[in-house]
C-alpha cells in the first residue's frame, strides 16, 4: 500500500517514461517505467527519502534517454501520487 510519494512523466524523442519516488510498506523506493514497452527501466530501488528517490529516478531516466534517444531529460514536474 502506498503511503506517500510523487511521480513525473517524460515524453522526449518518441520515448514515454514515468518516474516514481514513493514510500510504501517496503520503505522508500525509486523506479522508472517505460510506458511504450510496458517495462521497468529501473525497478524499485531502496532510497533514504522521497527527495533522494526523485534524484535517483531522474538519474536513471537521464542515462536511459541519452543512451536510446540521444536526448536530454527535460525539467520535471513532480505530482503527488494517489494513496490507496
Outline where the language-model segments fall.
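Mixed-charge, Lys/Arg-enriched low-complexity segments
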Residues: 33-84
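Short N-terminal "domain-start" leader segments
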Residues: 1-29, 83
Amino acid at each position: 500500500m502506498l503511503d506517500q510519494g510523487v511521480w513525473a512523466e517524460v515524453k522526449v524523442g518518441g520515448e514515454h517514461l514515468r518516474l516514481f519516488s514513493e514510500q510504501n510498506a517496503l520503505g522508500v523506493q525509486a523506479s522508472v517505467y517505460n510506458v511504450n514497452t510496458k517495462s521497468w527501466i529501473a525497478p524499485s530501488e531502496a532510497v533514504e527519502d522521497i527527495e533522494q528517490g526523485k534524484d535517483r529516478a531522474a538519474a536513471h531516466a537521464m542515462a536511459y534517454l541519452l543512451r536510446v534517444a540521444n536526448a536530454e531529460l527535460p525539467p520535471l514536474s513532480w505530482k503527488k501520487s494517489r494513496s490507496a
